[in-house]
């Protein structure tokens, strides 16, 4: 027991997932089980468990059994939850448990009957997961997974069950198992055995499924081609395509997991009358022929490995027929499968939740004939809330409505605004709902018919918030799906197939249907309007005529819209408050709250700008707030931030040390020192702040901080001392004479030149360092270490400033990225040695990068191998300079 307590900390880390513990730790707690029969995990080995020293004492297990009866979750000790879970799987192996349905399939029945109390579990089959749980005393370790995500494997109890499930229902069954067993590995042999069996299974099933897939794919493609051509050719073919697509959808994505025998036969019967009956029969017939048991077997195999390799596979057509048999236990896998079937040859990774479920078999019309072509758009609609639709379709068979009552109902639901209060503005809704294929709202029909048709709501759309009462969904389904009694409407419903491209999203539709607004809870929950139905129809028609697109969410004519939306009086109720008593025109005036919030977002209207440009009405607290804000802004527009970000090279809190000293003590001509560096870095970064940081870094790294910096300053301030110091400190090559011009006396020649001129021998600014470095690195490489032949200062600095590679790369990259000539900057003076020289001619032997890089910063000093420095400007001198370097 002590040992067990001792290990707790290792396994548990705060997140509730175990941290991967070194295997030795696991062994400490659980030595290999003594009686284990590694080759055959199935038979019970209850006896061996008794020998296991780490098992809980018998008294403990007894207390556990008692608690098992009263499932006391709060105190659930390790064993209890374990056993309880096992018993669950036993009962539920046929009917999926809620948790199981999320992740894993039907779990095969446990290998041995389970009595409460962990002792009775065959020890060979004990999982690391359970051990860990017991080890930690972690009460619901059943939910908690060893190295896997909890969502993926929740209910796997026995090793063997895990083996079966993982191998079958998981894309990476094998690898997952390997993970499990590498942790739990009691003996290498068992693991190997498991893995090998899995791999054999995989091979076998892969071969089988490949053959089968090819056959099925061919059949299906043929039938689909036939259907497509026929449906495009003849108007009658619609209902048949409808039925066949439906059989696809049903067999593939069927929400109420009945084996597809029903659905396929049904679709066959339907399509039988139509000209292309054979095609329907073809797609349906094959699976029904075989016995269910066979099918199930086959499907499991296919599914697992199909899924496992779904990402690599190229022919993604296939077994939607066979999948339908699969019991409704792993929605995830099912979804993935069916998606792969629906999006025929796309190789994208499967996206979950993409499928359009047919909510109920009776509602045949919900899938219009265009379904096959529309797959991509339609499937997107699929379930954001599959649960809702499912429950409805299963529990209630929707009632029949006459066309009359349908219209009535729709009117009521639409005309009441209050339901919309808390809903997001419809524009946003539309972006959330992937485009609805037009085929569901027939458009190009004569005007009067239009009115009738469009007053049917769209097929139930997944709402961003689940406000729709189930009954509303039900009604809509029934309205949309039961073909209304008049034959004429039936005709209409299918016309748009020929007329309008099926995939055109709602945003582009010529006549925007009012129903986009939102599906609203059914009328029973709201006060009835006193309007007669005729009036309502008139209004609907009017709206369709007048209302520009962005007002639609409001459902009322623009005159009123304008009335409120431009003056944001937030806390005042709108002028009319008797919303429903008004004559029909005003029925749509919304309840006070929602008026303002929506229009601004949904349609861009004037008043957001007005808030800034001219003060709108006074009196509302909202307005008051805005005025205050404006005043605040006007008083101190940029004072706060300006110095930091506008010219960071002059003052930044970070760079105080170096910059302040330079600034304070430099003589008059010197203020521009930072400027040169800034231009230098702007070539690389383009932003002053970044420049400043970099510059600071180089200053701090590059110099031996205090001594060098003070020296720099002192030297600059007195030329004579400068001469002495520089001679004493640096071993100079013979031809360098430390002649330093006297700064204070005469005006600086050109800004960028002066920086280098005045510094003369002593530490060059960053730009210079960079130049030096680039030249050394990019020239032939003997120098590349960063040792520049020159005065001692610069040598040290160059090697240190920042890593050679960084500078060199920056410079070179820059150079290579933009070629082209560099504008000459003026006469070249070689201030260093005191001899002013102009050089020209010659082609560089080296790469163009150095030459280019030197061009980037206007005045930069390149240093040649003899240590002399030359001020570069024109291209010619640059070239000669490089030649100098290379010689």
Curated annotation (Swiss-Prot):
Biased composition (Low complexity): 57-75, 232-254, 311-326, 399-408, 428-456, 475-519, 526-542, 622-640, 829-844
Source taxonomy: Eukaryota, Fungi, Dikarya, Ascomycota, Saccharomycotina
GO cellular component: a single term: nucleus
Subcellular location: Nucleus
UniProt superkingdom: Eukaryota
Coiled-coil blocks: 199-234
Name of protein: Transcriptional regulator DEF1
Gene inactivation effect: Leads to yeast-locked cells.
Keywords, ordered alphabetically: Coiled coil, Nucleus, Transcription, Transcription regulation, Virulence
UniProt keyword RNA-binding present: no
Function, in words: Transcriptional regulator involved in extension of germ tubes into elongated hyphae and maintenance of filamentous growth. Regulates expression of UME6. Acts in a pathway that regulates maintenance of hyphal growth by repressing hyphal-to-yeast transition and allows dissemination within host epithelial tissues. Dispensable for invasion into both host oral epithelial cells and enterocytes, but required for epithelial damage.
Bias (Basic and acidic residues) ranges: 203-231, 696-710
Chain intervals with Polar residues compositional bias: 1-13, 76-107, 261-270, 364-393, 641-658, 729-745, 865-887
Region (Disordered): 1-117, 203-293, 311-330, 350-542, 555-578, 614-675, 696-758, 813-887
Biological process per Gene Ontology, one example term: single-species biofilm formation on inanimate substrate
Induction (UniProt): Regulated by EFG1, NRG1, and TUP1. Expression is increased with increasing cell density and during host infection. Expression is repressed by linalool.
């Amino acid at each position: 027991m002590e040992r067990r307590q001792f290990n707790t900390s290792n396994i548990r880390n705060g997140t509730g997932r175990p941290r991967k513990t070194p295997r030795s730790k696991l062994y400490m707690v659980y030595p290999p089980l003594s009686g284990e029969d590694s080759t055959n995990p199935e038979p019970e080995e209850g006896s061996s468990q008794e020998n296991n020293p780490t098992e809980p004492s018998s008294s403990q297990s007894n207390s556990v059994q008692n608690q098992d009866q009263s499932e006391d979750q709060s105190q659930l000790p390790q064993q209890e939850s374990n056993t309880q879970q096992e018993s669950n799987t036993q009962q539920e192996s046929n009917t999926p448990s809620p948790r199981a349905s999320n992740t894993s399939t039907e779990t095969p029945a446990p290998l041995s009957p389970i009595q409460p109390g962990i002792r009775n579990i065959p020890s060979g089959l004990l999982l690391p997961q359970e051990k860990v749980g017991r080890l930690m005393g972690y009460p619901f370790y059943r939910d908690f997974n060893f190295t896997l995500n909890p969502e993926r494997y929740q209910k796997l109890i026995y090793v063997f069950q895990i083996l079966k499930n993982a191998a079958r229902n998981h894309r990476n069954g094998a690898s997952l198992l390997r993970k499990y067993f590498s942790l739990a590995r009691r003996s290498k042999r068992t693991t190997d055995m498991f893995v090998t069996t899995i791999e054999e299974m995989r091979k076998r099933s892969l071969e089988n499924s490949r053959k089968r897939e090819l056959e099925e794919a061919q059949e299906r493609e043929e039938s689909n081609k036939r259907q497509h051509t026929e449906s495009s050719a003849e108007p009658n073919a619609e209902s048949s395509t409808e039925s066949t697509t439906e059989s696809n959808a049903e067999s593939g994505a069927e929400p109420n997991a009945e084996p597809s025998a029903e659905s396929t036969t049904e679709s066959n019967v339907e399509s039988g009358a139509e000209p292309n009956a054979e095609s329907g029969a073809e797609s349906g017939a094959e699976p029904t022929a075989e016995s269910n048991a066979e099918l199930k077997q086959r499907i499991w195999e296919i599914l697992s490995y199909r899924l496992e390799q779904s990402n690599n596979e190229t022919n993604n057509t296939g077994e939607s027929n066979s999948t339908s048999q699969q019991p409704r236990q792993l929605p995830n896998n099912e979804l993935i499968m069916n998606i792969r079937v629906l999006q025929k040859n796309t190789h994208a990774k499967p996206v979950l939740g993409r499928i359009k479920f047919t909510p109920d078999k009776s509602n045949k019309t919900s899938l219009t004939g265009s379904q096959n072509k529309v797959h991509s758009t339609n499937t997107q609609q699929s379930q954001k809330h599959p649960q809702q639709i499912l429950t409805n379709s299963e529990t209630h068979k929707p009632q029949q409505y006459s066309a009359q009552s349908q219209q009535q109902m729709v009117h009521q639901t639409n005309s009441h605004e209050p339901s919309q209060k808390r809903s997001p503005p419809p524009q946003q809704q539309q972006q959330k709902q992937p485009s609805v294929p037009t085929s569901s709202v027939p458009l190009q029909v004569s005007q009067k018919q239009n009115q009738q048709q469009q007053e049917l709501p769209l097929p139930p759309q997944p709402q961003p918030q689940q406000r729709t009462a189930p009954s509303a969904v039900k009604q809509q389904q029934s309205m949309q799906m039961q073909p209304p009694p008049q034959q004429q409407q039936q005709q209409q419903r299918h016309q748009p197939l020929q007329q309008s491209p099926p995939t055109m999203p709602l945003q582009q539709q010529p006549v925007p249907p009012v129903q986009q607004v939102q599906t609203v809870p059914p009328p029973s929950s709201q006060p009835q309007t006193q309007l007669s139905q005729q009036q309502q129809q008139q209004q609907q028609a009017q709206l369709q005529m007048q209302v520009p697109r962005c007002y639609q969410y409001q459902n009322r004519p623009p005159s009123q819209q304008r009335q409120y939306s431009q003056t944001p009086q937030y806390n005042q109720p709108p002028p009319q408050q008797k919303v429903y008593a008004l004559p029909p025109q005003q029925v749509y005036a919304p309840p006070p709250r929602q008026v303002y919030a929506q229009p601004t977002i949904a349609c861009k209207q004037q008043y957001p700008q007005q808030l800034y440009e001219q003060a709108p009405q006074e009196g509302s607290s909202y307005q008051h707030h805005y005025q205050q804000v404006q005043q605040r802004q006007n008083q101190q527009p940029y004072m706060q931030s300006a110095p930091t970000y506008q010219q960071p090279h002059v003052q930044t809190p970070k760079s105080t040390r170096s910059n302040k000293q330079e600034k304070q003590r430099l003589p008059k001509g010197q203020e521009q020192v930072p400027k040169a560096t800034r231009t230098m870095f702007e070539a690389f970064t383009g932003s002053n702040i970044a420049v400043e940081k970099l510059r600071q870094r180089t200053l701090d790294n590059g110099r031996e901080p205090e001594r060098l910096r003070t020296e720099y300053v002192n030297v600059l301030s007195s030329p004579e001392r400068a001469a002495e110091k520089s001679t004493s400190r640096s071993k100079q090559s013979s031809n360098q004479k430390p002649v330093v011009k006297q700064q204070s006396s005469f005006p600086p020649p050109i800004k960028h030149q002066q920086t280098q001129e005045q510094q003369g021998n002593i530490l060059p600014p960053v730009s210079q360092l960079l130049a030096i470095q680039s030249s050394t690195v990019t020239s032939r490489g003997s120098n590349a270490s960063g040792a520049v032949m020159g005065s001692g200062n610069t040598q040290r600095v160059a090697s240190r400033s920042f890593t050679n590679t960084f500078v060199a790369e920056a410079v070179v990259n820059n150079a290579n990225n933009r070629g082209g000539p560099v504008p000459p900057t003026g006469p070249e003076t070689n201030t260093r040695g005191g001899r002013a020289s102009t050089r020209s001619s010659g082609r560089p032997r080296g790469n163009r990068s150095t030459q280019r890089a030197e061009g980037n910063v206007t005045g930069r000093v390149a240093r040649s191998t003899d240590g002399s420095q030359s001020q570069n400007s024109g291209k010619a001198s640059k070239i000669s300079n490089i030649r100098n370097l290379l010689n």
